[in-house]
């Protein structure tokens, strides 16, 4: 059940309109990235955290980790031009065959229970993603007009972490690089390989990614609810 997690943290998060890396935004007394790191710090099967960063922010991350120490081993790695390239740089730092998780730095509410199920599924199937059934009707548009309505019953909103056997994910990234393919997530790279399928593990609607200012309101509400549950 042991695993290594790669967390791409080099994005600027322009939709957050914070004027800085959104992972540095304070949430209930600590930066968003610290809340995310604490999830893995408190999960015994996590052997190492690879934090992929923008080189210009290396000192910022060092200072942050000095102020908010994390006991699990963390390696800071310089990322690439796109998220996909950053993840690949992180994967290069892992030598021992294992299950590797790829997780958004701005997704601090994933639970240990879901991580355990995800790792277990990846060990068996090779690749697995957390996802939740889509609640809303999804339509494809052309300009400002509806072009198609999809059957919602078969649609899932994919989250992170996503879990893979290390060798499989490395192969998928190498293949994507060789063919110049840029995917929307790591699972999409594996889906392109012959003979491999990605399993779905049902997650939670509270495992939100903090992308826009409104998400911070939802995050505070989730934290308040979690705090209330702990006090019961």
Swiss-Prot record:
Disulfide bonds: none annotated. The record marks 152, 209 as: Positions MEP for the nucleophilic attack. The record marks 15, 22 as: Transition state stabilizer. Keywords: Isoprene biosynthesis, Nucleotidyltransferase, Transferase. It is an enzyme of class 2 (transferase). PROSITE patterns: ISPD. Its EC number is 2.7.7.60. GO terms for biological process: isopentenyl diphosphate biosynthetic process, methylerythritol 4-phosphate pathway. It catalyses: 2-C-methyl-D-erythritol 4-phosphate + CTP + H(+) = 4-CDP-2-C-methyl-D-erythritol + diphosphate. GO terms for molecular function: 2-C-methyl-D-erythritol 4-phosphate cytidylyltransferase activity. Pathway: Isoprenoid biosynthesis; isopentenyl diphosphate biosynthesis via DXP pathway; isopentenyl diphosphate from 1-deoxy-D-xylulose 5-phosphate: step 2/6. InterPro entries: IspD (IPR001228), IspD/TarI (IPR034683), IspD/TarI_cytidylyltransf_bact (IPR050088), ISPD_synthase_CS (IPR018294), Nucleotide-diphossugar_trans (IPR029044). Pfam families: IspD (PF01128). HAMAP family: IspD (MF_00108). PANTHER family: 2-C-METHYL-D-ERYTHRITOL 4-PHOSPHATE CYTIDYLYLTRANSFERASE, CHLOROPLASTIC. Belongs to the IspD/TarI cytidylyltransferase family. IspD subfamily. Catalyzes the formation of 4-diphosphocytidyl-2-C-methyl-D-erythritol from CTP and 2-C-methyl-D-erythritol 4-phosphate (MEP). This is 2-C-methyl-D-erythritol 4-phosphate cytidylyltransferase.
